[in-house]
């Protein structure tokens, strides 16, 4: 009886505490409303208090975007030179993609793959004909596309190449980045990604990037099913391989009966001045991964493209996703691809990128030690001192009206939306130059 009474008293106390908490929260919310919209500082503090600390954002609180620009909650305007890591290549809130989303969202958004829908086949036909592959497997995020490619490679290795079951290997390049799932970090050579998350996926090996002799040695192993590589390494710091590297990869993979998987999640879809970055060397990978700009930044959409001899090794029930291939995502992806085609954004990226790099090369070499990139995927390398590093440069760029983000310490990635015009490139370069000269 006493224990029951104690329990009742505890419950009553908890209820009183809950009412107090709710009242307090309501009071804070009311006070916040009375004070007007949240400030940047309030937004920073709220995220820090309630969200996981798995990112280190540049301190700017954004509320609106259009084309190549974004605005913070105080109304300040910025050039966007990150494009959500390339996802908003078509520009923020592109009207055609927005309209496609609106037209579909009132009709049907999700069926799962338990049933057919009337948009998936239209999208599959469009994207496979556009890139000249037999089949597409629709997923949502870039890392899901990478996982899909690994499963396809292993299954193909067992059923087509004849690798002993569960002995298949996939080779990756040092500096690779394709996500943060356990499989992705198992292939990583960056301690920030993998340290403390083992044990790791077996059957993954790494070799130096841009090193054809190393690849040839690795492919001597008959258990290698695939080599997965970024045509330009993005997260590693926009590392552009030597001319002929991708041609050599294609030749070696063909010679050793190994699948060439091109991770075009960041480099593909016109970003480097071609539809795919591999197009610079006119090579055709066995598997192509697409994502990011495949939806124009409106919705997570990714895709894995390959031919029947690879894709059809996976049977019904062996791989999939509840949201992959949903009608909303498919309608958005069609529109996003049409924008790239209709607005000739690959050509614009090629032209604007050349202007950008030419102007960046004029920056003082005592601060900027290197400029590299293709199309509108570029980077500058900052000489670190006690007063100057990539993070400090990005903070000052923000203050001057341009948003960019460091990658790997001393490197700043510069990747604006592909709709940027020449006068906007030159205005952006003036901001970058002014910022660099201030150090």
From Swiss-Prot:
InterPro entries registered for this protein in UniProt: Aminotrans_3, Aminotrans_3_PPA_site, Class-III_PLP-dep_AT, Orn_aminotrans, PyrdxlP-dep_Trfase, PyrdxlP-dep_Trfase_major, PyrdxlP-dep_Trfase_small
Tissue: Expressed in the head and flagellum of epididymal sperm but not in testicular sperm (at protein level).
Record keywords, A-Z: Acetylation, Aminotransferase, Mitochondrion, Pyridoxal phosphate, Transferase, Transit peptide
Catalytic activity from the UniProt record: L-ornithine + 2-oxoglutarate = L-glutamate 5-semialdehyde + L-glutamate
N6-(pyridoxal phosphate)lysine: residues carrying this PTM: 292
GO cellular component, one term: nucleoplasm
UniProt entry tagged with the keyword Transferase: yes
Keyword Repeat: no
Broad enzyme group: transferase
Modified residues (N6-succinyllysine): 102, 107, 362, 405
Modified sites of kind N6-acetyllysine: 49, 66, 107, 362, 386, 392, 405, 421
EC number: 2.6.1.13
Cofactors required: pyridoxal 5'-phosphate
Lineage top rank: taxon: Eukaryota
One example of a Gene Ontology biological process annotation: L-proline biosynthetic process
Pathway(s) it belongs to: Amino-acid biosynthesis; L-proline biosynthesis; L-glutamate 5-semialdehyde from L-ornithine: step 1/1
Similarity section: Belongs to the class-III pyridoxal-phosphate-dependent aminotransferase family.
Subunit note: Homohexamer.
Biological function: Catalyzes the reversible interconversion of L-ornithine and 2-oxoglutarate to L-glutamate semialdehyde and L-glutamate.
Name of this chain's protein: Ornithine aminotransferase, mitochondrial
Gene: Oat
């Amino acid at each position: 009886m006493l224990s029951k009474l104690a329990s009742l008293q505890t419950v009553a106390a908890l209820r009183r505490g809950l009412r107090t908490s709710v009242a307090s929260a309501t009071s804070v919310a009311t006070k916040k409303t009375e004070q007007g919209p949240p400030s940047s500082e309030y937004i920073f503090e709220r995220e820090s208090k309630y969200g996981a600390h798995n990112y280190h954002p540049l301190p700017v609180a954004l509320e609106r975007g259009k084309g190549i620009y974004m605005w913070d909650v105080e109304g300040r305007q910025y050039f966007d030179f990150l494009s959500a890591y390339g996802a908003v290549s078509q520009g923020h809130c592109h009207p055609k993609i927005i309209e496609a989303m609106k037209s579909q969202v009132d009709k049907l958004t999700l069926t799962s793959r338990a049933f057919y829908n009337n948009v998936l086949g239209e999208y599959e036909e469009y994207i496979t004909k556009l890139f000249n592959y037999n089949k597409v497997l629709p997923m949502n995020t870039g890392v899901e596309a990478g996982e899909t490619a690994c499963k396809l490679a292993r299954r193909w290795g067992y059923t087509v190449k004849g690798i002993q079951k569960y002995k298949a290997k996939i080779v990756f390049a040092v500096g690779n980045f394709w996500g943060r799932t356990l499989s992705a970090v198992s292939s990583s050579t960056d301690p920030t990604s993998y340290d403390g998350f083992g044990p790791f996926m077996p059957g993954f090996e790494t070799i130096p990037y841009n090193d054809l002799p190393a690849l040839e040695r690795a492919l001597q192993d008959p258990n290698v099913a695939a080599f997965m590589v970024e045509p330009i390494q993005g997260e590693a710091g926009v590392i552009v391989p030597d001319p002929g590297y991708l041609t050599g990869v294609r030749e070696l993979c063909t010679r050793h009966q190994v699948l060439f998987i091109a991770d075009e999640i960041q480099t593909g879809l016109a970003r480097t001045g071609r539809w795919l970055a591999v197009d610079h060397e006119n090579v055709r990978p066995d598997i192509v991964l697409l994502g990011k700009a495949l939806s124009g930044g409106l919705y997570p959409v990714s895709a894995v493209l390959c031919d029947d001899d690879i894709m059809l090794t996976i049977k019904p029930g062996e791989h999939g996703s509840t949201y992959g291939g949903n009608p909303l995502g498919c309608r958005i992806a069609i529109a996003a691809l049409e924008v790239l085609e209709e607005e000739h954004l690959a050509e614009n990226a090629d032209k604007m990128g050349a202007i950008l790099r030419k102007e960046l090369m004029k920056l003082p070499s005592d601060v900027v030690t290197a400029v590299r990139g293709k199309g509108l995927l570029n980077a500058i390398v900052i000489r670190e001192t006690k007063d100057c590093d990539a993070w400090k440069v990005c903070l000052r760029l923000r203050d001057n009206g341009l948003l960019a983000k460091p990658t790997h310490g001393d490197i700043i990635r510069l990747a604006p939306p592909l709709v940027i015009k020449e006068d906007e490139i030159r205005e952006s370069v003036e901001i970058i130059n002014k910022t660099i000269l201030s150090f």
